[in-house]
């Protein structure tokens, strides 16, 4: 939304803002849930029960189609193949993708126009940007089919959670990063409605101990079945309920876009009396992974893309070994991304989920490159292991770890009323046990922890280059 439209929107009363949001959503829904949406949903419903080998065979066929299309219509890939003496016939399936180099963010920025297919009308392409959580935002383009398949994958996640998306589906409260309420607004309502999808949209930028009671009055009046949002925002809502001694039963909670830590999951499930279903997706639309009702990990949406795990030399790693997450989109033929190197690390599993689906299982993605601490002695510390000192401290409203130097971290604390000197000493002691005596640990009391412009929250922020 440009500045003029934003100012005009901000000047409108809340009911008119809701009407505009609903109308805009209805326009987007034609593409998201129109076209081949039902076809993709039926395909995903059928294929999820195939064996792993059969699913890979289906992917092999899609890879051949993608490679042929890319060679014939995308200048970047035509040159890449020719320079390497390759023909499309040399890539017979997923296993042959290793004959091609990984595609980096820098490659996309330098060759943006050359990566666009001449076979897809430019007016039909949609633009998107990564959030910039691991660097500067990256612009990518995708065709309508990629948009539709993304929402078919999301629809399957909702179905696995026992819920239904859409105007005639379950009522959903959404707590994400869109600035739907003017930031200068000091009084409720800090929410808007989207009737086209049966949603109540919450502002993530106005939540405070002073305002949360008003939020929950609105949520209660809306009577939702589902809560969908960023883990950090869901956790704020859940902690408020816990501190008030209240339970707010829902059918399911859907989380995505940030790492969901175990302490967040347990608090959210306790407060909302239901299971959390977490999914992983990227703006580049190369990977989509969802959680079923067994909660044994994330199922890769193998209809959506091919996923590889590589070591630091770009060599494939076996199942069970953690490495760089690399994805090839099987949905986006407008700007094909083949072997795109994400900034994420994870591992694939060799065994199936007990649910019986053949979709390959992926471990949680918890270690984005900038969020790993690198210490002076060369150790790298995953943020997940740093959550434990905070678990018993219900006196902390919010926290954030910032690494300024190899031997110094700052722990930002938004304290509750009962936060004490003993709690501070506990944190320093427990963190020092995990980081070592050579690391200086400073506790900084703050009113709020900063978020990214997208509204997302990074719990661990490292300003030190990754040491691996």
Spans of features found by a protein language model:
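Conserved adenylate-forming
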Residues: 65, 177-303
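Generic structural signal for residues in well-ordered beta-strands
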Residues: 199, 276, 307, 399, ...
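Residue-level signal for inorganic ion chemistry
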Residues: 70, 130, 172, 227, ...
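Carboxylate/His-rich catalytic cores and anion/metal-binding grooves
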Residues: 161-185
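AMP-binding/adenylate-forming catalytic core of the ANL superfamily
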Residues: 227, 331-437
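Nucleotide 5′-phosphate-binding alpha/beta core
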Residues: 1-129, 136-169, 221-228, 242, ...
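Conserved AMP-binding/adenylate-forming
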Residues: 260-352, 369-371
């Amino acid at each position: 939304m440009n500045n003029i439209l934003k100012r005009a929107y901000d000047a409108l009363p809340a009911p008119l803002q809701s009407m505009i949001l609903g109308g805009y959503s209805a326009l987007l829904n034609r593409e998201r849930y129109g076209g081949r949406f039902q076809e993709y949903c039926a395909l995903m419903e059928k294929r999820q029960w195939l064996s792993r080998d059969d699913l890979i065979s289906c992917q092999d066929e899609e890879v051949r189609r993608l490679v042929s299309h890319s060679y014939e219509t995308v200048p970047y890939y035509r040159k890449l193949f020719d320079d390497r003496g390759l023909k499309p016939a040399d890539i017979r399936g997923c296993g042959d993708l290793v004959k091609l180099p990984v595609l980096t963010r820098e490659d996309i920025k330098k060759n943006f126009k050359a990566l666009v297919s001449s076979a897809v009308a430019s007016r039909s392409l949609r633009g998107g940007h990564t959030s910039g959580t691991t660097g500067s935002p990256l612009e990518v383009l995708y065709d309508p089919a990629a948009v539709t398949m993304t929402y078919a994958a999301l629809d399957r996640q909702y179905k696995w959670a026992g819920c239904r998306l859409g105007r005639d589906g379950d009522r959903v409260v959404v707590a994400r990063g869109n600035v739907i309420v003017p930031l200068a607004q000091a009084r409720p309502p800090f929410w808007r409605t989207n009737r086209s999808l049966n949603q109540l949209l919450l502002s993530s930028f106005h939540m405070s101990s002073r305002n949360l009671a008003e939020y929950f009055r609105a949520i209660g009046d809306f009577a939702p079945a589902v809560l969908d949002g960023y883990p950090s925002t869901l956790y704020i809502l859940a902690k408020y309920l816990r501190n008030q001694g209240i339970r707010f039963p829902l059918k399911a909670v859907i989380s995505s876009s940030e790492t969901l830590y175990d302490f967040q999951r347990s608090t959210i499930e306790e407060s909302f009396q239901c299971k959390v279903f977490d999914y992983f997706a990227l703006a580049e639309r190369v990977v989509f992974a969802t959680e079923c009702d067994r909660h044994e990990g994330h199922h890769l949406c193998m209809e959506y893309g091919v996923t590889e795990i590589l070591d630091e030399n770009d060599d494939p790693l076996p199942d069970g070994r953690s490495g760089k997450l690399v994805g090839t989109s099987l949905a986006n033929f407008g700007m094909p991304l083949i072997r795109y190197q994400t900034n994420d690390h994870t591992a694939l599993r060799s065994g199936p989920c007990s649910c019986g689906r053949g979709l390959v299982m992926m471990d949680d993605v918890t270690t984005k490159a900038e969020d790993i601490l690198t210490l002076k002695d060369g150790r790298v510390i995953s943020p997940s292991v740093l959550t434990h000192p905070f678990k018993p401290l219900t006196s902390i409203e919010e926290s954030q770890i910032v690494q300024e130097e190899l031997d110094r971290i700052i722990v930002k604390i938004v304290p509750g009323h009962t936060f004490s000197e003993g709690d501070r000493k506990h944190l320093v002691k427990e963190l020092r046990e995990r980081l070592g005596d050579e690391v200086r640990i400073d506790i900084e009391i703050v009113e709020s922890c900063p978020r990214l412009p997208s509204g997302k929250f990074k719990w661990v922020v490292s300003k030190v280059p990754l040491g691996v």
